[in-house]
């Protein structure tokens, strides 16, 4: 397979268990399972999944797309930027949010939105300030001071093409603010969230830096580095392409070891008993999907997000309910994706 970052050859270095291709609850309950195969570029060390068609990639998101982000999370990002670049940083700036078709980073009518599909309420609010297009294939003929790329880069089939087109719309002294999941973090903790179909590329700080250098960009400042990498990026006029050497085989071996430990903790906790599930998001779906037939023992699934209620949990035929006390059984074991003051509960965020 050809590297979708630099065009060189790759080698296969890892395969996941069978995972649901769409990790979101749906109204229909029809799910396809397949493995994710991870390929490492011999030259630039980019990590990518196997090739999928555009039509196949769209199917990973299902028909019942959910809004995964929150206003307070966006507000924290904006505050972090102001703390690093000044409280008036956004004044008189032309701004573009690539991938903001569902949940734009700023509710400001001067912001431009670019996405392959933009919700009607977003179109209505931003008037003519939107581009409904595939940024991997199409260019935007306008220059911006600031471009946001928030949890979008990892979803591109061809990140080099996307970055190249985004760069064309950046003013020479402009900045791109990029946020991606930190793959290094997920090789050690919450490993169930490390590799799945929607994330077509995996980035540590070095992997991200390599992709940017190939496109004559560089990381100006790392704003946050935890389970995510949030950084400012600028054009590199020196044209020096510094490629970091990365031992991807070592990285995936570390993941494999910690992934097995995660599976072991879940199996030991549930001990083949009936159990309740609290939280039905992608993290829970991936955690339970990592263990064969474990969903057969689910008693009830609860989620207080009304958009998920009465929908079907992936890899099962079980409906999701809003939690009420009438369902509560203190003696039955449970697994959750948040802190739950209940005896016999395992919080997957802690493993």
Which residues does each predicted region cover?
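Conserved N-terminal segment of class I S-adenosyl-L-methionine
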Residues: 1-150, 163, 225, 237-269, ...
């Amino acid at each position: 397979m050809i590297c979708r970052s630099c065009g060189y050859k790759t080698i296969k270095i890892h395969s996941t268990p069978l995972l649901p291709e769409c990790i979101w609850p749906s109204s229909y309950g029809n799910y396809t399972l397949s493995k994710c195969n991870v390929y490492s570029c011999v030259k630039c060390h980019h990590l990518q999944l196997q090739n999928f068609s555009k039509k196949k990639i769209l199917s990973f998101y299902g028909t019942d797309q959910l809004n995964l982000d929150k206003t307070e999370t966006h507000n924290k990002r904006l505050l972090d930027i102001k703390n690093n670049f000044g409280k008036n940083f956004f004044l008189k700036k032309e701004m573009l949010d690539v991938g903001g078709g569902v949940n734009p980073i700023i509710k400001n009518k001067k912001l431009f939105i670019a996405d392959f599909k933009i919700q009607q309420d977003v179109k209505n609010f931003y008037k003519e300030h939107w581009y409904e297009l595939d940024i991997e294939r199409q260019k935007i003929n306008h220059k911006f001071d600031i471009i946001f790329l928030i949890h979008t880069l990892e979803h591109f089939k061809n990140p080099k093409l996307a970055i190249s087109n985004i760069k064309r719309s950046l003013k020479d002294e402009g900045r791109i603010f990029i946020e991606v999941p930190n793959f290094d973090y997920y090789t050690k903790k919450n490993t169930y969230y490390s590799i799945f179909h929607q994330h077509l590329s995996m980035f540590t700080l070095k992997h991200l830096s390599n992709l940017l250098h190939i496109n004559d960009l560089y990381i100006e400042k790392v704003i946050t580095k935890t389970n995510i990498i949030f950084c400012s990026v600028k054009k590199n006029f020196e044209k020096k392409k510094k490629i970091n050497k990365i031992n991807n085989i070592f990285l995936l071996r570390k993941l494999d070891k910690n992934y097995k430990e995660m599976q072991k903790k879940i199996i030991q906790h549930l001990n083949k008993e009936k159990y309740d599930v609290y939280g039905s998001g992608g993290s829970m779906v991936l955690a339970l999907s990592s263990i064969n037939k474990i969903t057969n023992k689910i008693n009830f699934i609860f989620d207080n997000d009304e958009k998920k209620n009465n929908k079907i949990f992936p890899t099962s035929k079980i409906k999701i309910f809003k939690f009420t006390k009438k369902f509560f059984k203190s003696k039955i074991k449970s697994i959750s994706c948040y802190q739950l003051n209940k005896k016999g509960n395992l919080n997957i965020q802690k493993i």
